[in-house]
Amino acid sequence: MNIVYFGTPEFALAPLQRLLQTETYQVLGVVTQPDRRRGRGNQLSPSPVKAFALRHGLPIWQPPRLRQDPQLPEVLRSLAADVFVVVAYGQILPQSILDIPRYGCINIHGSLLPRYRGAAPIQWALYHGEEETGVTTMLMDAGLDTGPMLLKRKVRIHLEDNATTLSAKLSETGADLLLDTLQQLPQLQAEPQNDAEATYAPLIQKSDYAIDWGRSALALHNQVRAFYPYAYTQWQGTALKILQTWPLIPEVAAKLPEPLQSYVREPEAAAPPGTVLALIKGWGPVVQTGKGPLLLSQVQLSGRKAQSGWDFVNGVRLAIATQFAIVPSAL
């Protein structure tokens, strides 16, 4: 089976790698987003998928605007691919491209559709505290993640998962599911989505990263792991990224690391939100939220390396009753 692969970020690597490892499938080329300026040097850098394709000698196309490229549809048509596989490509495929391959365009989506349609399903599943998500393969249509579904596979979300770890799990699961889908493709019966059950996962905005200590400990924990590594608060006028937290509340006590379970308390308004309540040796500061205490176990001051919450306590001589600024979020 001949395949053209559309993909851009790290999430799209495992399925592409799995295709190349399987003799049944021939990857004819890769379509990915144009190089972007990244890092402190602001240098042009290829997408993870492009870098992978270069290492493996695959033809690469990088149209800035897929809908405005008059030549690419003809190039793709000339390849006579059986199927296009699309994984977090980053642009909507026009009907003129969807109609090209014999078996259509198969998308790997990082949720159990029709839940979390859109650009950021992994992040919003974490944000909403889901304990289960998964991967869906579907036949693409002109809508946003609205095509008929082929196969699904569930993945458990753990309390310590963040956007990076969950993305890696779903990418590997998606790679397995893609091979199963392609193997069964001629016989698979696509299942229409129930639009009444659809939920949405829109693009993330920078304003979503701000920590509002008036929210509950569990809600803030979910925000930190959903938007890892960008959630932040303010400490003495400086941005402080919050990279890892543990809500010290009864409803998740059994899921906490064992050394922390003895610190679990019933939520009470012991101090104004954002106030440091305690310092747990070897772990970090415990902060009052709108409902329950939240342990900050990994943080990063602006311009510095990430560090444990305890190293932060010692480095800045953080004291009990210190107040973190409340930065009202847009959420």
From Swiss-Prot:
Q: What is its EC number?
A: 2.1.2.9
Reactions the enzyme catalyzes? L-methionyl-tRNA(fMet) + (6R)-10-formyltetrahydrofolate = N-formyl-L-methionyl-tRNA(fMet) + (6S)-5,6,7,8-tetrahydrofolate + H(+)
Q: Which species?
A: Thermosynechococcus vestitus (strain NIES-2133 / IAM M-273 / BP-1)
The UniProt keywords, alphabetically, are: Protein biosynthesis, Transferase
Q: What GO cellular component is one of the record's annotations?
A: cytosol
Report residues binding (6S)-5,6,7,8-tetrahydrofolate: 111-114
Task: Give the family, as the similarity comment puts it.
Answer: Belongs to the Fmt family.
A GO molecular-function annotation: methionyl-tRNA formyltransferase activity
Q: Identify the domain of life.
A: Bacteria
Instruction: Write out the function statement from the record.
Output: Attaches a formyl group to the free amino group of methionyl-tRNA(fMet). The formyl group appears to play a dual role in the initiator identity of N-formylmethionyl-tRNA by promoting its recognition by IF2 and preventing the misappropriation of this tRNA by the elongation apparatus.
Q: Entry's InterPro entries?
A: Fmt (IPR005794), Formyl_trans_C (IPR005793), Formyl_transf_N (IPR002376), Formyl_transf_N_sf (IPR036477), Formyl_transferase-like_C_sf (IPR011034), GART_AS (IPR001555), Met-tRNA-FMT_C (IPR044135), Met-tRNA-FMT_N (IPR041711)
Q: What is the lineage of its organism?
A: Bacteria, Bacillati, Cyanobacteriota, Cyanophyceae, Acaryochloridales
Broad class of enzyme this protein falls into: transferase
Gene symbol of the encoding locus: fmt
- Does the keyword Protein biosynthesis feature in the UniProt annotation? yes
Q: What is this protein called?
A: Methionyl-tRNA formyltransferase
Concerning Pfam families, the annotation shows: Formyl_trans_C, Formyl_trans_N
